[in-house]
Curated annotation (Swiss-Prot):
It comes from the Eukaryota. Transmembrane segments: none annotated. It comes from Mus musculus (Mouse). Residues 341-351 have a biased composition (Polar residues). Residues 341-361 are annotated as: Disordered. Belongs to the FAM131 family. The lineage of its organism: Eukaryota, Metazoa, Chordata, Craniata, Vertebrata. It holds the Pfam family FAM131. This is Protein FAM131A. PANTHER family: PROTEIN FAM131A, PROTEIN FAM131B-RELATED.
Length: 361
């Protein structure tokens, strides 16, 4: 009968018949001692008892051919507290399968923690939305654990409609954050060049740079969105005196030449604008009011919504139809073609001289 001595106490193992189970019997001294309680400890399969003469374990005992009487002093002492020493050397090193199983269990535990921390199952899992994404910061919570627990459980107490509304609000907030980030990135990259920015620069340039020399009448034309490009500050040519009254054909020609010269240099455009102001100052009151009404009319016309390069022809193609758009408002009187061309050149330069006037007479 095998015997095991644990901390000096004798435990006798006895098998109940061939193929039966093994039972542990203690001595009367151990059983009568209240400080001792027998606990069933399952030893690993590879543990061998050298005192029995053959390798036997608690799970697979084999009946010895002849009983052997073994003294209790010769039995080895087993330290129950040291679990590593109880394992055999072949089982102390973990195999790759056991490491993989440990990694899988650890990953499963981590994923479960993340799922409990980030997402919460809702009542919308029936084919619509499986989880409500509620981001919770991983930093140290400032609230008490009871408050956090109530915040987690508050969603499940809501009705289905309130849950859907809360989810829709969260999705809308995420879309707003994403759109704000995209706009910030595009503004950093310089892609956010809209018409509003041009309009702001345009009006700002008029108020600061061009308000003094241009006057209020041309500012009305600018604010009427007649020109689709911002005006840059250019060199202002000195004004010259004009003592002659300008005819309607000169006004129409100057308007067309002014529109054609927008693509030119800033100095040429500024001189044309100054010439228009001089012409406006010399007009009678009736014609001056008609000239002021050109800005709103041209702003409403769809022709001026197209780029200036499309509405203005080349100098070779411009001469036959130079004042086609202005003939409805200002009919041209009968006269020679040379005089019209000369007046157009005078208006495009923005200066009316006395020598050219004498030639016209």
């Amino acid at each position: 009968m095998p015997m095991i001595s644990v901390l000096g106490k004798m435990f006798l193992w006895q098998r109940e018949g061939p193929g039966g189970r093994w039972t542990c019997q203690t001595s009367r001294r151990v059983a009568s001692d209240p400080a001792w309680a027998v606990e069933w400890i399952e030893l690993p399969r590879g543990l061998s008892l050298s005192s029995l003469g053959s390798a036997r374990t608690l799970r697979g005992w084999s009946r010895s051919p002849r009983p052997s009487s073994v003294d209790s002093q010769d039995l080895p002492e087993v330290n129950v507290g040291d679990t590593v020493a109880m394992l055999p050397k072949s089982r102390r090193a973990l195999t790759i399968q056991e490491i993989a199983a440990l990694a899988r269990s650890s990953l499963h535990g981590i994923s479960q923690v993340v799922k409990d921390h980030v997402t919460k199952p809702t009542a919308m899992a029936q084919g619509r939305v499986a989880h409500l994404i509620e981001w919770k910061g991983w930093s140290k919570p400032s609230d008490s654990p009871a408050a956090l627990e109530s915040a987690f459980s508050s969603y499940s107490d809501l009705s289905e409609g309130e849950q859907e509304a809360r989810f829709a609000a969260g999705v809308a907030e995420q879309f707003a954050i994403a759109e704000a980030k995209l706009r910030a990135w595009s503004s950093v990259d310089g892609d956010d060049s809209t018409d509003d920015s041009y309009d702001e620069d345009f009006t700002g340039g008029i108020d600061t740079d061009m308000a003094g020399p241009l006057g209020s009448h041309l500012q009305d034309l600018f604010t009427g969105r007649r020109f689709s490009r911002p005006v840059r500050q250019g060199s202002v040519e000195p004004e010259s005196d004009c003592s002659q009254t300008v005819s309607p054909d000169t006004l129409c020609s100057s308007l067309c030449s002014l529109e054609d010269g927008l693509l030119g240099s800033p100095a040429r455009m500024t001189s044309q604008l100054l010439g228009e102001e001089l012409l406006l100052a010399r007009l009678p009151p009736s014609r001056e009011s008609a000239f002021r009404s050109l800005g709103p009319l041209e702003a409403q016309d769809s022709l001026y919504n197209s780029p200036l390069s499309e509405s203005c022809l080349s100098p070779a193609e411009e001469e036959p139809d130079s004042c086609k758009d202005c003939q409805l408002l200002c009919p041209l009187p009968t006269g020679s073609w040379e005089r019209q061309q000369q007046v157009s050149d005078v208006a495009s330069s923005g200066v009316v001289s006395l020598d050219e006037d004498e030639v016209d007479q």
